[in-house]
């Protein structure tokens, strides 16, 4: 039987399905590349202009800034709720994760309703103190604040999983050598959290790059905004493909950058092997500032938008307002979520088994391709699958199956 040397005993019955899955994952990039290469000279001249570079720069700066802010929020909350005696610890630990369930578009709309130029805060200040204007929430600043408040739980989840498994013996050794709590955190605890910060930061940056709802509502021009406008306002689909491909390249660049940083850094042991109880740090006089910090983040990211949403619901019910199609939309959303979860489990299981059981070059390549597929912004995948689906036609085009594949 003919055997390819680099396969080295890998079962073809497992390898072939994994190759097909990897091909499907990377097919949007392949299609966008082919479509972009088919663009004429005028389309390329339109694309290779200063305005495009400016939009790419704005997207990149927003993603980096949001990641930095999320790190500044998540690291203190994770440390406070896992390694200190902060009051209401479980309350902060649970409530700090919940902003993850608020979609960015809805969250941005709620924030604008409260903090916008004509929002509730303005109306209160105008009535009580005759203040005629408040700082503008639109643009980069508003996008940075709102996306950071809604996406920091991605990083917080990875940090919580790691900080509970850090090697406590190193902290004890540092304490015996005379280091204080601050130096122990900076020299011992924080280096053990760096891999989680990098991976969580990557999730946040990819989420920011792919976000369309918040930036469109806040009028901040990013690549997702440009792609949507080009797709809806022009018949030149090659120009849309060029913008979508540039967004994919930017996302893959972030993935490569994170992988490079992770490889170059020293690796620290995160688990001591034998479970040891972590030392709980006494906050003392810092108890109140810690509670204020956690409370402020939870209030801004969860309580304020949810309260505004509940207020609207109650006001609508009091005025006998109805939402047509609410039940059907809810069923469709639930069905889509369940089907997508089942499909993800089915597709991820053979790839995980292949990469762990047969750690070869080909299995690692398949795994990286699937990671790259995950890193692609949703609007770029949507554009590519619309192109592919329109070529295939019925029954795939505009079907639930195509939507599940995209998700």
Protein language model regions, located:
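Hydrophobic positions on the alpha-helical face of helix-turn-helix-like DNA-binding modules
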Residues: 173-174, 184, 188, 227
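Helix-turn-helix DNA-binding elements, focusing on the entry/boundary residues of the two helices
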Residues: 170, 237
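Cytosolic juxtamembrane amphipathic/interface segments immediately preceding
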Residues: 1-10, 178, 275-283
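Membrane-water interface segments at the C-terminal ends of transmembrane alpha-helices
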Residues: 6-39, 50-164, 192-212, 240-259, ...
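Glycine-rich helix-loop "coupling/hinge" segments at transmembrane-helix boundaries
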Residues: 209-235
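Feature of multi-pass inner-membrane transport and sensor proteins
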Residues: 45, 125, 167, 183, ...
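Short alpha-helical segment immediately N-terminal to, or the first helix within
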Residues: 45-46, 162-163, 187, 216-217, ...
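Glycine/proline-centered hinge or cleavage motifs at structural transition points of membrane proteins
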Residues: 177-179, 191
